[in-house]
Amino acid sequence: MARASLKRLSGIDRSGGPPPETQKGEPLRPWTIPNAVSYVRLALLPVFMVVALGSGDGRDPTAAILYFLIAWGDQLDGLAARLTGQYSRLGALLDPLTDRALVISGVIVCWHFELLPRWALAVLVARELAMLVLAQVGLRVGMDLKINMVGRWAVWPVMFAIFLAMIVDTWVATASLYIGLALTLWATAIYFADGYRFMQARNRPSSST
């Protein structure tokens, strides 16, 4: 029982579905402890960009530590939500948005200084743009696009690759980026498949009795 509670607290156990407070149509509830963590993460992004782009060659321990702290904040706001029970619709929207902003910020730095293969970075950016389009389409047709588990895991190898590339020139960073890219494309395929099934069900005429 204690082990099950620990898994749920750590975020490993996500059985039971998302909390009802995070669902579409619920109030945003901006003033919560988890959302405050997200606000700090967002506020640190321009600081990271200034430090990283002003580093000279992109390899700067201060920039790497900032990137790590912003990335780790994703775990912190989730833990805060589970400890306090302060779930919110805004938090459900803000968390993936902050993660995407962090990935794109890291991609800009790595592209500028050529720390990682640019073709892979370009694919990542193209994927994020595709997800923005899919999210907009989903909003228009009433589909609530939920993050799948592959998508949750995909972001970590990418962030690790960016973090490591800002510290040292190593093949490990490139390999981690490729792993994250493969998972990211897999997650994207799942999103589009879900969207296709939703549209099929939406356009299917209801049978009359």
Model-found features: residue ranges?
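A feature for the membrane-embedded catalytic helix bundles of lipid/isoprenoid biosynthetic enzymes
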Residues: 2-50, 62-69, 97-209
